[in-house]
Amino acid sequence: MDYNQRHKNCIDQFKKEFEETAITVSGGANYAKVADRQRIFREHFPDAQVLTDLKSIDDTHVVFKTLIKVNDKIISSGWSRTVLKSKAKAIEFGETVSLGRCLANFGLTGDEYASIEEMIDVPNIKIEKPVVK
């Protein structure tokens, strides 16, 4: 199967499953978990390389860049910048956000571009609908 058909099938599966796995926050926007995006992506692109690179770290921030390659061609990228003091696991969180943005750039995104992982710490945001598995 060629790349374009695999991409279409991946997006179609994501949209179908998003109906069941989306997390709704106050205001009615629906978000996807990075783990759900990655699982679906891997089903359609098991041969892809996901390359996460810690670009910089200092006393206040950590910056990650994630690339996805298929057949040695970059098909998507994503960046994150995380405040170190805001999370106990800021490095892991930053890597996850970078991957989520990379998968969103690929087309695996819900009603909103951000993932639920990014939205959890936003002030005045309340999760209304839990994940259904």
Give the label of every model feature segment:
Residues M1-K133:
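Polyanion-binding surfaces on beta-sheet-dominated domains and ring/shell assemblies
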